[in-house]
């Protein structure tokens, strides 16, 4: 399964320490093996799933959009939008998705 990392995701990972980067990599691997593991969001975030994992007694969230299962599509792509702690997580995610929609791009 192909992984597509969006800018907020990459910015957080770039600033993270090595042990946290490894934990994020493990979480991404879990999501890729079972894309339906995260909680489905509704409203402004419809179509987005959020997977939660713990690292050093802190809960982190990974926002992603699972692939659409179609028989004609051989290559499945998961879009990873954002990773971080709960503080301002959903506000940043909504802002990013709205910004992409305002520019005429499909997020």
Give residue spans per PLM region.
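Enriched for short, Lys/Arg-rich terminal
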Residues: 55-61, 65-107
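Residue-level signal for secondary-structure boundary elements
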Residues: 21, 36-39, 101, 105
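Arg/Lys-rich, positively charged N-terminal/basic patches that mediate binding to nucleic acids
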Residues: 1-27, 107
